[in-house]
Curated annotation (Swiss-Prot):
This is Molybdopterin synthase catalytic subunit. CDD domains: MoaE. It comes from the Eukaryota. It catalyses: 2 [molybdopterin-synthase sulfur-carrier protein]-C-terminal-Gly-aminoethanethioate + cyclic pyranopterin phosphate + H2O = molybdopterin + 2 [molybdopterin-synthase sulfur-carrier protein]-C-terminal Gly-Gly + 2 H(+). The gene is Mocs2B.
Amino acid sequence: MNHIKLIDCPIDVTYAINLISDPSCGASSIFIGTTRDSFQGKKVVSLAYEAYENMALKEMDKICSDLRATWPDLKHILIYHRLGTVPENEASVVIAASAPHRSAALKAVTFAIDQLKSRVPIWKKEIYEGNHDAEWKENSESIRPKKSLSSFNYSVCKVDESRVVSRNLVQIRANDCELKNRVECFFKRKRAEINSCNVIDFKQSNLSSNINSDTEVDVSCARTQSTISKQEQSNCHLKVRRATNRCGPQQMQFRPEYKHELSRLTASRVSTNEVGESLQNSRLHSIETYMGLTSKNNENIINRIKNVENRILLLESTSPEYQHFFEQSCMDQPEKKIKTNKTYSAHELRVYIHRKNKECP
């Protein structure tokens, strides 16, 4: 059984021994921590203990679990710690354990007091006699780091060098000093770029009238020796640029009415019978199949053509860039035949004239 408690009154050691006693145990080990009367030549009157009780009790219970996991033969475990002011020669902490054999009991008590000092959030203040100021003391077993993270010894960490990495896979091969120098140079360059790209809101004025306007002034004050320079056609001294989007939701209102325009241009004045006689249903059916439309052969052919046109119109309205933003390639244009004048020789001309004379008697 585990006996854990934080108390404000003096600890009864006899009562603690009776709690851990058991007929099946042949050994009981107990540790009693008391207040000593001096520290580094100063007279100690008392000790004042404070604790975060909820967390302290949880940690004490975890210590008991660790003890039972390490020494399963332990029968009873007792951890009592006193809070408040503890005068000299009075018990501030009592740790006891009982087991069938002395080895487990002795080792468990030693382990418990070390863990109590290092893990449980209990703080101690020493109160001295005379004019000496009271001091809060930290346990030497505390696991909290006493040094900053910058002083971490990286040489302790072992590096697995058994796996050799090809140098072709390493992009940065500089040492720490070179990397630090590169980072500093990068910061300086970016700072210079930002300074050069910043908008100049003010113009520097000359300090006195006798200074030439071409002479630069090393010392000036932007608050008292500058004037605001506004941009042309603007009420602000900062540059304002207007963005023009050629394609997007803002341009929807400027697009033509595709359906209305296509209906007007494709209106047919030919009767249904004449069109039905001139067109082949097989070719129209192939177009409808390719466009994903279904129709009957006995349906009005004008309505079928209209459905195909509406389908093409829908595709063009979904992605109008293909029709409006691409120019026709020169490869699509038909090649023009180049006419060349034939050149005749003198002999060919004589033969040609002689032949004509024979044809015309």
